Amino acid sequence: KAYAFNVKREGYLFYSDNFSLIDNKIDSSLIVNIPLQPIETGASIILKNIFFDVNKFQLKQESLTELDKVVLMLNENPAIRIQISGHTDNVGKDADNTALSLNRAKAVMGYLLSKNIDPKRISSKGFGATMPVASNESESGKALNRRTELAVTSD
């Protein structure tokens, strides 16, 4: 079964993650090091509980809890501005990946705007497969590269 969790502390970007207990025994412990970052220009997080179907940019229902955490953070910190960045793995054409990543970032931005966040506070950008965080040689690496990031910006 899949689980998600969020950690929040005043003055810091929230942290979220997801995990499965399929490969773990019931009696084993799960220990997680949680790196919280101060809310300041340049700080960024991967929104690990944002989900899309393959080659689609419509947000899956499971993403809304995470997005509501972003809305709460923005409401609690009215002076910050953010950029939402979409990223893909390297499967497919570069132009298609760039368009998909931009459309996914815009979908996230659209949800935030629907929750009355000032559009001047949010921007979106699609990077396609140009900024991998892992090797695209394995399925697990590709999964890490398919991500949505939130970065605090100065303008």
Features from the language model and the residues they span:
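Envelope-exposed proteins and targeting segments
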Residues: 3, 30-32, 46-48, 55, ...
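Periplasmic OmpA-like peptidoglycan-binding domain that tethers envelope proteins to the cell wall
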Residues: 77, 83-155
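A structural detector for beta-sheet-dominated domains
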Residues: 8, 20-22, 35-37, 48, ...
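Structured interaction patches on ligand/partner-binding surfaces of diverse proteins
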Residues: 10-32
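Surface-exposed coil/turn segments at beta-strand junctions on protein surfaces, enriched
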Residues: 25-27, 40, 75, 143
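A short, solvent-exposed beta-strand micro-motif common in secreted/extracellular proteins
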Residues: 1-11
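Short, solvent-exposed beta-strand/turn patches at coil↔beta or beta↔helix junctions
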Residues: 39-80, 85-99
